[in-house]
UniProtKB/Swiss-Prot annotation:
CDD domains: AAI_SS. Seed storage protein. Might be integrated via inter-chain disulfide bonds within the glutenin polymer. This is Avenin-like b2. Transmembrane segments: none annotated. Keywords: Disulfide bond, Seed storage protein, Signal, Storage protein. Belongs to the prolamin family. Contains disulfide bonds. Residues 1-18 form the signal peptide. InterPro entries: Bifun_inhib/LTP/seed_sf, Bifunc_inhib/LTP/seed_store, Glia_glutenin. The keyword S-adenosyl-L-methionine does not apply. GO terms for molecular function: nutrient reservoir activity. It comes from the Eukaryota.
Length: 285
């Protein structure tokens, strides 16, 4: 019976993808012919992600299946295939693959929806896709993509702050439990805290050692800017002991949480304090 169910699901998934191939290929037109072979291969591999993100899927009823776990929809099947394909792509190529997905979706949208400059639209779409795919698939996707840098160079400080946004989110405990869309997979129920903590450590490990101090300072600045202004009255005067102590504690927390080297001597660049919060223990907030 299990073999029959698996075969049926595979047949259903293949049928769903076959129905989507025509729509995807027609949306690109002649632009596909100008793409390099590697790009065409990535686009073919990422078709389930294009279909899912455009919500080109409809509920699929299978009344002859008895258990609730087996009551799948075509959306769930395409979502699973998207995550499976993305996991098979090497990390260094995922940015490029997602960029191809963005271009495919933009080309299929009507021009009326893109009144703003095309580069800004692509930049926003890229950021949204990175966040959605990273959380949906519970997989690492680099925040700083080379394709993003081609769309518009940002100052180095802003790049570091954007790259360590997961660290700021984690340190402020702005996370809540999430559920796994496929309960039949024997994995623990992860929390968004664990996902964000993993992203924070991965991003921090990719930053060269000589820039990590500045990156942590940018995280502190991001946290400070998100706090109500009344909480910071009187904190803009130089308070060197408090600054160094707060930064030292923040560095120590990230150092132990990520098990990564961060220079002990990390001077404070500006005269502000860092609001301290307790870190999560064993990935639980």
């Amino acid at each position: 019976m299990k073999v029959f169910i698996l075969a049926l699901l595979a047949l259903t998934a293949t049928t769903a993808i076959a129905q989507l191939e025509t729509t995807c290929s027609q949306g690109f037109g002649q632009s596909q012919q100008q793409q390099q072979p590697g790009q065409r291969q990535l686009l073919e591999q990422m078709k389930p992600c294009v279909a899912f993100l455009q919500q080109k899927c409809s509920p699929l009823r299978m009344p002859f299946l008895q258990t609730q776990v087996e009551q799948l929809s075509s959306c769930q099947i395409v979502q699973y295939q998207c995550c499976q394909q993305l996991a098979q792509i090497p990390e260094r190529t995922r940015c490029h693959a997602i960029h191809i997905v963005v271009e495919a979706i933009i080309q299929q949208q009507s021009q009326q929806q893109w009144q703003e400059p095309q580069q800004q639209a692509q930049h926003k779409s890229m950021r949204m896709l990175l966040e959605n795919l990273s959380l949906m698939c519970n997989i690492y996707v680099p925040v700083q993509c080379q394709q993003q840098q081609q769309m518009g160079q940002q100052p180095q400080q802003q790049q570091l702050q954007e790259q360590l946004t997961p660290c700021a989110t984690f340190l402020q405990h702005q996370c809540s439990p999430v559920t796994v869309p496929f309960p039949q997979i024997p994995v623990d129920q992860p929390t968004s805290c664990q996902n964000v903590q993993h992203q924070c450590c991965r991003q921090l490990s990719q930053i060269p050692e000589q820039f990590r101090c500045q990156a942590i300072h940018n995280v502190a600045e991001a946290i400070r800017q998100q706090q109500p202004q009344q909480q910071w009255q009187g904190m803009y005067q130089p308070q060197q002991p408090a600054q160094h102590e707060s930064i030292r504690m923040s560095l120590q927390a990230l150092r132990s949480m990520c098990n990564i080297y961060i220079p002990v001597q990390c001077p404070a660049p500006t005269a502000y304090n860092i609001p301290m919060v307790a870190t999560c223990t064993s990935g639980a907030c």
